[in-house]
């Protein structure tokens, strides 16, 4: 039985002070000793250290991104070792906004995954198709390529989580049904099985990241290949986020 994992991605929201308030609200609402599923939050870089001091081991601290080089002349970038030292145990790689706003390719995502793993971080690697790709009938090709190329040259996926983000269902007014999400999650698991074997694929946790809300979380998380969520907007409200977390139990 795969343990569900729910991570709140705060994106470019919340000052340090606001982040501390939200983190405190989440930990208080979850209560002491919550073990029903793995829970993490990904505040902005500026708040990581302070939030980590506040939450301790009660919540996994996740970085929203990192560079693929350990150091050097890369103005504005942050390395995996830097976020690890700030208290992070995990990092997101290849989020759809990084791909579409900043031009990150599958090859770049692959380098980030490898570097983060080498620093001992868990990696949440994202994959997903756009509305144009969905309507063009190439969802399978796009997602399979993202998974295959993102995991190229990696031997051990035990510290990897994959998050499926149907970009076409985020902010477009279109909604992915639980069946549509499950179909792609199964495709991802089968792709990983082809690469790493059935046993490794069976252990892999695959999150769903397409506008999860308290109202649809339970149904999504009941699907056999959906192992939790990578939560965007709803994670900025403690009550909504905790409701989603508890739907995973």
Curated annotation (Swiss-Prot):
Q: What class of enzyme is it?
A: isomerase
Give the EC number: 5.3.1.1
One GO CC annotation:
cytosol
Protein's cellular compartments: Cytoplasm
InterPro entries, A to Z: Aldolase_TIM (IPR013785), TIM_sf (IPR035990), TrioseP_Isoase_bac/euk (IPR022896), Triosephosphate_isomerase (IPR000652), Triosephosphate_isomerase_AS (IPR020861)
Question: Pathway, according to UniProt?
Answer: Carbohydrate biosynthesis; gluconeogenesis; Carbohydrate degradation; glycolysis; D-glyceraldehyde 3-phosphate from glycerone phosphate: step 1/1
Q: What does the UniProt keyword field contain? A: Cytoplasm, Gluconeogenesis, Glycolysis, Isomerase
State the active site. Answer: 95, 165
Q: Does the keyword Kinase apply?
A: no
Q: Which residues bind substrate?
A: 9-11, 171, 211, 232-233
Describe the task this protein carries out: Involved in the gluconeogenesis. Catalyzes stereospecifically the conversion of dihydroxyacetone phosphate (DHAP) to D-glyceraldehyde-3-phosphate (G3P).
Q: Which family does it belong to?
A: Belongs to the triosephosphate isomerase family.
Q: What is this protein called?
A: Triosephosphate isomerase
């Amino acid at each position: 039985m795969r343990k569900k994992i729910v991570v709140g991605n705060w994106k470019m929201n919340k000052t340090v002070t606001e982040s501390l308030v939200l983190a405190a609200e989440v930990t208080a609402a979850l209560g002491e000793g919550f073990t029903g599923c793995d829970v993490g939050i990904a505040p902005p870089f500026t708040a990581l250290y302070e939030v980590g001091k506040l939450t301790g081991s009660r919540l996994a601290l996740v970085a929203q991104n990192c560079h693929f080089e350990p150091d050097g002349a890369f103005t504005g970038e942050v390395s995996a070792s830097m976020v690890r030292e700030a208290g992070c145990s995990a990092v997101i790689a290849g989020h759809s906004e990084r791909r579409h706003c900043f031009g990150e390719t599958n090859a770049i995502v692959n380098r980030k995954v490898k570097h983060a793993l080498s620093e001992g971080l868990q990696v949440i690697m994202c994959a997903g198709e756009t509305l144009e790709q969905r309507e063009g009938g190439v969802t399978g090709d796009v997602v399979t390529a993202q998974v295959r190329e993102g995991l190229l040259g990696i031997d051990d996926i035990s510290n990897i989580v994959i998050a499926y983000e149907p970009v076409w269902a985020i902010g477009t007014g279109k909604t992915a049904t639980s069946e549509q999400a499950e179909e792609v999650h199964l495709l991802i698991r089968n792709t990983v099985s082809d690469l790493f074997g059935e046993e490794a694929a069976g252990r892999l946790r695959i999150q769903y990241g397409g506008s999860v809300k308290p109202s649809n979380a339970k149904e999504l998380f009941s699907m056999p290949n959906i192992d939790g969520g990578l939560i965007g907007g709803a994670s900025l409200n403690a009550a909504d986020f905790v409701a989603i977390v508890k739907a995973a139990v």
